[in-house]
A protein has these predicted regions:
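Membrane-helix interface segments in multi-pass membrane proteins
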Residues: 50-89, 144-176, 234-277
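Helix-coil boundary and N-terminal low-complexity module in membrane systems
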Residues: 1-140, 204-206, 283-322
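Hydrophobic alpha-helical membrane-embedded segments
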Residues: 90-98, 176-185
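Juxtamembrane transition segments at transmembrane-helix termini in multipass membrane proteins
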Residues: 1, 182-198, 222-322
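Nonpolar helix-loop interface/hinge motif
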Residues: 6-58, 62, 178-258
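Hydrophobic, well-ordered secondary-structure segments
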Residues: 127-128, 167, 171-174, 187, ...
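Generic low-polarity alpha-helical segments
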Residues: 130, 156-162, 210, 219-220
Length: 322
């Protein structure tokens, strides 16, 4: 392995060498602070576009809820309405992860892009990003069914006894391990789709190769730590707002419209969470992708050449996948 000590060529937010955890977090923070418009501003704009219609629809549907507890329809409209903002959050996250991967990719070379340039650079990749999300959902359902199917069927036929309960507990633990494994092996799908211009299926295969071997544990650890950090920050910000909203509804005598306000609060919480946390978590994934390509493919050499001589970023893989 090459000795990188003392090599600190830094045209942008990172030194062009293998990155430490501190390098990654510092670079993402620098990218967000140095380009608020294309990070948090774009996150706000995208979230508003996606969340406003779904939150409004959710509030309207939830407002149709009956408060007759003995009604067969009790809870139906409220549940549907309260869930609709989640769809808006999902759509926003699909677009945002792509936008932010592009912004971070340009920032690596010291290039500051605006909202318009980011849109131009990523809009053709949105169908592939959506396809990747669909494949992820299908895969999650398949894995869940494969692991929990037999234990649940046994519990349904034999009832809950010592054996079936133990089997269910073991199955749930196995499911958690499987999710963490797949979550790590598919960590770079979004970055690969946006930066390398690959399709959804090819991006999954590429991410699988880049996360193989010993780097798996490092990637898992960094992503897990990042998830804890952003979740904590989101809860610290969102929870007081949610509690204030609930108590405000009760104080104003709006219990009859609790489901409608729940949908609205869900949309507001999703908006705040997206603006505050998504730029950081998406930026970490993008930089981990760059880091793995530096370690495995010598991408730093190509990035140095591009930084010194100009030209488009060398994101499409210049070496044979391995």
């Amino acid at each position: 392995a090459p000795a990188y000590a003392g090599l600190e060529f830094r045209p942008g937010i990172i030194p062009l060498r293998p990155l430490s955890l501190g390098d990654v977090y510092s670079a993402v923070t620098k990218a967000v602070r140095g380009n608020v418009a294309a990070t948090m501003g774009l996150a706000l704009l995208t979230s508003l576009v996606c969340l406003i219609p779904f939150t409004a629809l959710g509030a309207w549907v939830a407002n149709q809820e009956t408060l007759e507890f003995d009604s067969e329809e009790f809870g139906l409209y409220g549940t549907i309405g309260s869930s609709l903002p989640t769809i808006g959050s999902l759509l926003a996250s699909i677009a945002l992860t792509g936008f932010l991967a592009y912004v971070i990719g340009q920032a690596v070379l010291g290039r500051k892009v605006g909202i318009g340039e980011t849109w131009d650079g990523t809009k053709r990749r949105l169908p592939a990003l959506a396809g990747a999300v669909v494949l992820t959902i299908v895969g999650a359902v398949a894995v869940t069914g494969a692991i929990l199917g037999v234990p649940i069927a046994l519990a349904a036929s034999q009832g809950f006894n010592g054996f079936t309960v133990m089997l269910l507990v073991l199955a749930f633990l196995l499911l958690v391990v499987a999710y963490l494994f797949l979550w790590t092996r598919t960590a770079f799908v979004t970055s690969v789709i946006v930066l390398e211009g690959r399709g959804a299926f090819n991006a999954f295969a590429r991410s699988w190769r880049l996360t193989s071997g010993r780097p798996f544990w490092r990637i898992l650890g960094i992503r897990f730590l990042t998830s804890i950090l952003v979740s904590t920050v989101a809860q610290v910000i969102v929870l007081p707002i949610a509690l204030f909203g609930v108590f405000g509804i009760i104080a104003l005598g709006g219990e009859s419209q609790i489901f409608m306000w729940q949908a609205i609060l869900g949309g507001v919480s999703g908006l705040i969470s997206a603006v505050i946390t998504t730029p950081f978590s998406a930026g970490v994934d993008a930089l981990l992708t760059v880091d793995q390509r530096i370690r495995r493919e010598g991408l730093d050499v190509q990035l140095i050449h591009t930084a010194q001589h100009g030209g488009p970023p060398p994101w499409p893989s210049a070496v044979q996948d391995r």
